[in-house]
Design a protein with these regions (language model features):
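A short, polar/proline- and glycine-enriched secondary-structure boundary/capping micro-motif
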Residues: 20-22, 102-104, 133-138
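Glycine-rich, often proline-containing surface loops adjacent to acidic residues and nearby aromatics
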Residues: 28, 90-92, 120-125
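Generic preference for hydrophobic/aromatic residues in regular secondary structure cores
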Residues: 28-33, 80, 108, 124
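Compositionally biased, intrinsically disordered low-complexity regions enriched in proline and serine
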Residues: 37, 47, 59, 68, ...
Length: 151
């Protein structure tokens, strides 16, 4: 777990067996905030940019010069949805992440919303790394945790 003034990272590691051996599963939630300056911050492009800059700074891999970034290509396009949750505007982004200079990746889900004083955007990001295992249940678990934080 890592923490700074505008960044919190919580992760859970577990080992799980399948027919090919034992594999690491990681579920993580990352919370970060940034100044709110424009409605344009609630776009896929901006959300990818801020997510990738935070990830490059804090979500490092074990391989030298490795860090997490979002994928947004033909094979793994990011998707977004604007919604209201308890009268709060929320911009939801889903997609896939990968490690630069390493061979890791998986799904992520991100919720961006304004702080109570409307001066900051708060992002709550959940990601899963689970090679050889179904990831949809794991990402739904994180989504439930994130959703409860929005209530």
């Amino acid at each position: 777990n890592k923490k700074s003034e505008h960044f919190w990272w919580f992760s859970q590691l577990e080992m799980k067996k399948d027919q090919n051996g034992t594999h690491e599963i990681q579920k993580g939630i990352v919370i970060y905030n940034s100044p709110y300056t424009s409605e344009n911050q609630f776009t896929i492009n901006y959300q990818q940019q801020i997510r990738d800059s935070i990830s490059k700074m804090y979500l490092k891999g074990t391989t030298k010069d490795s860090y997490m970034i979002s994928r947004n290509d033909d094979l793994a396009p990011m998707q977004s949805e604007a919604m209201y949750i308890n009268d709060k505007y929320v911009f939801k982004t889903t997609g896939a992440w990968k490690m630069v200079n390493d061979k890791m990746g998986g799904p992520f889900i991100n919720y961006a919303f304004l702080s109570k004083n409307n001066r900051e955007i708060i992002n709550i990001d959940g990601y899963v790394y689970a090679p050889n295992f179904e990831k949809s249940k794991l990402i739904r678990e994180l989504e439930a945790i994130i959703y409860s934080a929005l209530n």
